[in-house]
Amino acid sequence: MSTYNIVVVGAGVTGLTTALLLSKTPANKVTVIAKHMPGDYDIEYASPWAGASYMPFGKKGSDHAEWERATWPALRDLAEHQPESGIHFQDITIHNRLKDQNTATGQWSAELTSANPWFKDFVLNFQNLPRDQLPPGIDNAQRFTSVCINTAIYLPWLVSQCMKNGCVFKRAVLKHISEAAETHHSGKKANVVVNCTGLASRTLGGVADDQVYPVRGQIMIVRNDPGSMTSISGSDDGGDEVSYIFPRAAGGGTVIGGTYQKNNWDPLPDPNFANRIMQRALKLDPRLVKEGQGVEGLDIVRHGVGLRPARTDGPRIEKDQVDGVKVVHNYGHGGFGYQVSFSCAEKAVGLVNEIIQQQHDRAKL
């Protein structure tokens, strides 16, 4: 049987999901190389800092929306049948203020906070809240059953599933994407390289995509558990500040955030933002603390900053050739990488298969 050597560059949720789907074909021999691996916490490595949840942001009819629709069944299946993955079902209430519609956070969440969103027909238990249940200042709100992902469990779980299928993991730092072709664990040149380097695609040689930019998100993890997820379209603290609360599965703590700061590279938590995040979280869901308590009732595990790997024209999922190396790109997913992970990986795998088929056909001539 013919075998095909594939190198996936990047071990965030996009790279790991792509490697997992590739490794399900026995003929594919997959090596994952990355500067950062699950267990690392670094400003260059976005995936561990994610909330993470399923909250569709894509505009109706867009590729983004279709990717979110197509990924939901996989996340739902994991929550139902493989709780060891760190994914569990959780209700979420989403609040919308019309005055946020022209802010960075309001535009980011416009589809999510719509009173009639495209995803209402397939998420679980969707309902619009009656007006008499809306908090002061809220113009509309919805509730449905989503999933929350404990990234500290899920990313290592993806690694374990890849390894079960024969994937080999190696740490490496590349200056140029073409170098990846020489890093396959077989010692042979890779048939295809899959670029899942996220924000690093801005500076990686052979890619150098100037459409890639960071969107800074500051969060904190607390031990307090309000019992369900909550978010809101914006805040009065600034157009790039927002509030969300995500209790993670299996003792992962509750993520509270946050910020949506485009082109901000600051890796350090800002104490002023942190204070505002706490104040907003308590206003959004007072169940976080005991009655009568303020922010002093929040039991903080740690503060964090992540840089969402956004791209001006949206994710890049396409074939390329760089210095004679066949490359498939899969990067630029911004703050929605988890909720499009399976569908974008499936598209990338399809492109890899096209390249391999072409190579196979040429070899027979």
Located regions from the model:
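Short beta-strand to alpha-helix junction loop
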Residues: K60-A74, A141-W157, L268-F273, V340-S341
